[in-house]
Amino acid sequence: MNSAQSPGSLSRLHSHFLDYLRRKKQRRAGRKWGRDQGNKRLRYSYDLGPRSLVFDCGAYLGDFASEVVERYQCQVFCFEPLQTYFAQLSRRFAGEAKITCLNYGIGSSSREAKISVEKDASSLFRATESAKLETVRFVDINEALQLAGGRKIDLLKLNIEGGEFEVLDAILDRNLATRFRHIQVQFHQIIPDFHERRLRIRAGLAKSHQIGYDYYFIFESWSLRPA
């Protein structure tokens, strides 16, 4: 066997081919999301009302929170760890009683960590050479749930550039999934074992929730099964 056909080379070729297939599948899902008008028809379509409670993780500039409050008059907690975007959120929603802005993210532990500042692509897990790094605060998911005062979270929205794996793993490991009626998540391909971890998380969620819509690494939504 020559070097081009060595086990290591074949393994790398196989890995590259799988990456190609996954990127192709994601592009296909993205086109379908666009055709289906997902940002208009799906992202905000939940059975919510004035008594509903929403956790918006990765609130960024507040567009998601603004839309769900306009539609449903529900209560929203916006989690945004980056100071620049938190400041903009706070100004935008000053005087809005339905929206609470919190200057921290949610994780599996309470800690400080460095995150890249790259608009809506800010992440713990990637940074361009020109990206600024900011030390931000995270709180444990159990601590964050205390904000609900024992109530269920009607919608957990996760768009946190790789942090979704940590949050959902913690929710499943601690048997907290039934605290959330709906979970909307955008998974990101920016950690080494993203494919396997997504599959494990989906298998865990399927024990208590059913899939609503599923656009591969674009957006997916899960709803708590009827009792």
Where are the language model's segments positioned?
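Phosphate/nucleotide-binding beta-alpha loop and adjacent structural elements of enzyme active sites
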Residues: 1-227
